[in-house]
Design a protein with these regions (language model features):
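Single-residue signature of alpha-solenoid repeat helices
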Residues: 68, 75, 116, 123, ...
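Terminal, low-structured helical/coil segments at or just beyond the last alpha-helical repeat
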Residues: 30-34, 198, 205-242
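Flexible helix-coil transition and linker loops at the boundaries of alpha-helical arrays
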Residues: 37-42, 80-93, 128-141, 176-187, ...
Length: 242
């Protein structure tokens, strides 16, 4: 059983956004709430948040995660206000989800893992709403699945299998959809494998353990397994891949 082996797929640092900052910030700026929904000070704060977010992305891409985190933290309150003012405006939901995710990446690079989990937890409802609104957006779906897995890992490390299980199960459904759409995509397959490894330890389902082992062996063999999943599968198989 997989539960005999240590869970190596623990909290890992978020990758920088694939979407360029100027494009996302411009999209968010265009989606700024109308004057009737927010007062002039709130609109000005939102516009400043777009500027701060863009500066944060620039700093993050240059490797200055401390500056990036500071800019993201400065931007977040106004973006939250915009979403609260008009929860149905999906462009602003997208902006908030990505800003929280980018902040988590910067905080993770600084070793502030408690902050990462808090940001992930806050972002999850927005990612869920975004994925539901854009069912063909595989990139957002994969980001959300990865966030759920990290949240599940944190619960599992803390000994709370009951709380971890639904997080893994939701991630598993998302990852299966991505792999069904593009079975050759290594990123999607690694997300699915991570979800299987986690769910195997909370669901008490031998079929999930077997699926994780079979998939992990194949990915070890073809070299597509990532650094997060590799130690878990090596522990399961009792082998050390080159």
């Amino acid at each position: 059983m997989l539960s005999r082996f240590p869970l190596f797929a623990l909290i890992t640092l978020s990758a920088p956004l694939a979407l360029s900052a100027p494009a996302l910030a411009q999209q968010a700026a265009q989606a700024a709430p109308a004057a009737g929904q927010m007062n002039s000070a709130q609109i000005a704060a939102f516009n400043q948040a777009v500027t701060d977010f863009t500066a944060g992305q620039t700093a993050q891409q240059a490797g200055d995660n401390a500056a990036a985190a500071a800019k993201y933290e400065a931007a977040l309150p106004a973006i939250r206000t915009a979403v609260q003012a008009d929860p149905a405006r999906i462009d602003n939901v997208n902006f908030l989800a990505n800003a929280l995710y980018a902040d988590a990446a910067a905080q993770g690079a600084l070793g502030r893992m408690d902050k990462v989990i808090a940001l992930y937890t806050e972002s999850a409802p927005y990612w869920r709403k975004l994925v539901e609104a854009k069912p063909t957006d595989a990139a957002s779906r994969n980001i959300f699945a990865g966030i759920l897995i990290q949240m599940g890992n944190q619960k599992l490390v803390g000994g709370d299998k009951t709380a971890a299980d639904p997080l893994y199960e939701e991630a598993l459904a998302l990852a299966r959809k991505s792999v069904a759409e593009n079975g050759k995509d290594a990123v999607s397959r690694n997300i699915l494998l991570s979800a299987l490894i986690g769910a195997s330890q909370t669901a008490n389902d031998p079929a999930l353990s077997a699926e994780a082992l079979t998939m992990g062996k194949a990915m070890l063999s073809d070299g597509t397994i990532d650094a997060m999943n590799k130690p878990s599968i090596e522990a399961m198989t009792g082998t050390k891949a080159g």
